[in-house]
Curated annotation (Swiss-Prot):
Organism expressing this protein natively: Homo sapiens
Keywords: Endoplasmic reticulum, Membrane, Metal-binding, Transferase, Transmembrane, Transmembrane helix, Ubl conjugation pathway, Zinc, Zinc-finger
Reactions catalysed according to its record: S-ubiquitinyl-[E2 ubiquitin-conjugating enzyme]-L-cysteine + [acceptor protein]-L-lysine = [E2 ubiquitin-conjugating enzyme]-L-cysteine + N(6)-ubiquitinyl-[acceptor protein]-L-lysine
A GO BP annotation: ERAD pathway
Role: E3 ubiquitin ligase that catalyzes the direct transfer of ubiquitin from E2 ubiquitin-conjugating enzyme to a specific substrate. In response to bacterial infection, negatively regulates the phagocyte oxidative burst by controlling the turnover of the NADPH oxidase complex subunits. Promotes monoubiquitination of CYBA and 'Lys-48'-linked polyubiquitination and degradation of CYBB NADPH oxidase catalytic subunits, both essential for the generation of antimicrobial reactive oxygen species. Involved in the maintenance of cholesterol homeostasis.
Gene designation: RNF145
Name this protein carries in UniProt: RING finger protein 145
Transmembrane segments: 53-73, 77-97, 123-143, 146-166, 168-188, 205-222, 225-245, 275-295, 316-336, 340-360, 384-404, 410-430, 460-480, 482-502
Segment forming the signal sequence: none
CDD domains (UniProt xref): RING-H2_RNF145
Active site: 537
Length: 663
């Protein structure tokens, strides 16, 4: 059953590709220039070419037929192709019969065939061909009335009966007329089929729109037609034909530079229409999806597909290519200019793919560094991919500076590549810190602060680079060529990459400063108080050699409580508000619960849970990106929720951080 479904899926795509190719050909065909060429040629007196408007109408009819073929249900589409195949077989039978009659007229032998070996060979060959045609036609049309397709065998039968050759010519024409009448009868009997199909399709569309709406109808058609795969196959066929046409006309092998130019030129030739441009967009999306899937498979193996079976990635790169192509008017340029512009757009797409690869690798690498996994192969894969993401973007930026004149788009590519390399450098530095802490007997002090400073340095550099890009874009807009699309891109880039990042970084800094001030304002527990308390930290579940005391008389590690205060300003146990003289400006707070009577220090909360009625304070959760969240990764190999075992997990900065993140 699975094989049948796969075959149907393949047919659903393969049978619709010709309709898109027909649309592409009709878009390329200029009717006016075609008639101008006809008028200059000897065909200008042909009545068929005297009616220009008729040809224009036929041009639009071709568009309608292409759209109908594209949207037909699979069963009707298969039936239509079978009818078309039957027509081709009948034409092949006509050609076989006509060639046989011509050969007999050339040799002019009217005697018995068994006396002439050559005549017998011609008869046998034609008879076998006609039998094959008749058999195939009856199989395709699923009928046992084989005589309906055997009219072209009449000249063979007449020759077998020693009919004169002049009469055989007349019989052959009669066979052609008879077959044509059969085709006309079939078309006439099915004349109302398209109308009935259109009527039933209209009823179904109206019902779907009334019940589910236009959006559901569009999504249903999108899934039934498999639009991304369909356009990708269409573009790959165009690209393969372009490559084949080039190599079929050349005898000598091309050099490496020539092959690169051929590759770009072929891509440029295959995106000269809106249909081929959409095909390139979906092809780039699938290529990006494949690269990102291989990246995740390289890092995690088959577990990557078990944890994340549906990777909805790759569309960002395709949409980026489409926006840039529309903005720059790609399909309206000449082939050479189009190839040059495509090279720049593809650089932008590659930079986006590298950034997506880093988004996949960053949490995996940090989780591997924070875990107790000692598999050298896993560490090698993670570090090798990070080294690739460190070197390749820098090399790409260097090549762009070498071969292209600097402008706004190239500056965006170079800045994105540099930021990717810097982010990988920060990821590797944090990974090294985790590994150093793993091999030390004692935990690294202030690990959380070190990680924060590393991330803060990267965020600051990222902000400065984004600011430089905006400044360069504004200067080009003022002193250079001004466009609406360019101004919109600068505005969007300024809002998302400058303003929001600056606002987020400032809030993060204020939250951290407020947490530090709160910790400093709390009293430090003495040795006698710790011995009298004789309990573990309720955040990290580790023994307490030093602790701070909250106003509600609860004991915590200073580092653990500080990380908790990054998230919310309440006691982890009783949720009493920890007041401080310096309130965080711009961040509101909600009413908190009063301390529960008899709340004990040894109350154990599950990870990721909250007491009934308690919600996170809006606006207090820090969102600094994937790397900031990964500094609170659990050290447990099984990644299960629950309480820590103090004997199994030694006291470290990473262990303390885990409950804070889950909170």
């Amino acid at each position: 059953m699975a094989a049948k479904e796969k075959l149907e899926a393949v047919l659903n795509v393969a049978l619709r590709v010709p309709s898109i190719m027909l649309l592409d050909v009709l878009y390329r065909w200029d009717v006016s220039s075609f008639f101008q060429q006809i008028q200059r040629s000897s065909l200008s007196n042909n009545p068929l070419f005297q009616y220009k408007y008729l040809a224009l109408n036929m041009h639009y009819v071709g568009y309608i037929l292409s759209v109908v073929l594209l949207t037909l249900p699979r069963q009707h589409l298969v039936q239509l192709y079978l009818y078309f195949l039957t027509a081709l077989l009948l034409y092949a039978g006509h050609q076989i019969s006509r060639d046989y009659v011509r050969s007999e007229l050339e040799f002019a032998y009217e005697g018995p065939m068994y006396l002439e070996p050559l005549s017998m060979n011609r008869f046998t060959t034609a008879l076998i061909g006609q039998l094959v045609v008749c058999t195939l036609c009856s199989c395709v049309m699923k009928t046992k009335q084989i005589w309906l397709f055997s009219a072209h065998m009449l000249p063979l039968l007449a020759r077998l009966c020693l009919v004169p050759l002049e009469t055989i010519v007349i019989i052959n024409k009669f066979a052609m007329i008879f077959t044509g009448l059969e085709v006309l009868y079939f078309l006439g009997s099915n004349l109302l089929v398209p109308y009935n199909l259109a009527k039933s399709a209209y009823r179904e569309l109206v019902q779907v729109v009334e019940v589910y709406g236009l959006l559901a109808l569009g999504m249903s058609l999108w899934n039934q037609l498999v639009v991304p795969v369909l356009f990708m196959v269409f573009w790959l066929v165009l690209f393969a034909l372009q490559i084949y046409s080039y190599f079929s006309t050349r005898d000598q092998p091309a050099s490496r530079e020539r092959l690169l130019f051929l590759f770009l030129t072929s891509i440029a030739e295959c995106c000269s229409t809106p249909y081929s441009l959409l095909g390139l967009v979906f092809t780039v999306s699938f290529v990006a999806l494949g690269v990102l899937t291989l990246c995740k498979f390289y890092l995690q193996g088959y577990r990557a597909f078990m944890n994340d079976p549906a990777m909805n990635r790759g569309m960002t790169e395709g949409v980026t290519l489409l926006i840039l192509a529309v903005q720059t008017g790609l399909i309206e340029l000449q082939v050479v200019h189009r190839a040059f512009l495509l090279s720049i757009i593809l650089f932008i797409v590659v930079a986006s793919i590298l950034q997506s690869m880093l988004e996949i690798a960053d949490p995996i690498v940090l989780a591997l560094g924070a875990s107790r996994d000692k598999s050298l192969w896993k560490h090698f894969r993670a570090v090798s991919l990070c080294l690739f993401l460190l070197v390749f973007p820098a090399y790409m930026a260097y090549m762009i500076c070498q071969f292209f004149h600097m402008d706004f788009w190239l500056l965006i590519i170079i800045s994105s590549s540099i930021l990717t390399s810097l982010q990988v450098l920060g990821t590797l530095f944090i990974y090294v810190l985790f590994m150093v802490e793993e091999f030390r007997k004692e935990p690294v002090e202030n690990m959380d602060d070190v990680i924060y400073y590393v991330n803060g340095t990267y965020r600051l550099l990222e902000f400065l680079v984004a600011l430089c890009v905006v400044a360069y874009g504004v200067s080009e807009t003022i002193f250079g060529e001004w466009t609406v699309m360019g101004s919109m891109i600068i505005f969007i880039h300024s809002y998302y990459n400058v303003w929001l990042r600056a606002q987020l970084g400032w809030k993060s800094f204020l939250l951290r400063r407020d947490a530090v001030n709160k910790i400093k304002s709390l009293p430090i527990a003495t040795k006698e108080q710790l011995e009298k308390h004789n309990d573990i930290c309720a955040i990290c579940y580790q023994d307490m050699k030093s602790a701070v005391i909250t106003p509600c008389s609860h004991f915590f590690h200073a580092g653990c409580l500080k990380k908790w205060l990054y998230v919310q300003e309440t006691c982890p146990l009783c949720h009493c508000h920890l007041k401080n003289s310096s309130q965080l400006p711009g961040l509101g707070t909600e009413p908190v619960l009063q301390p529960h009577a008899g709340a004990e220090q040894n109350v154990m909360f599950q990870e990721g849970t909250e007491p009934p009625g308690q919600e996170h304070t809006p606006g207090t959760r820090i969102q600094e990106g994937s790397r900031d969240n990964n500094e609170y990764i659990a050290r447990r190999p099984d990644n299960q929720e629950g309480a820590f075992d103090p004997k199994e997990y030694p006291h470290s900065a990473k262990d303390e951080a885990h409950p804070v993140e889950s909170a």
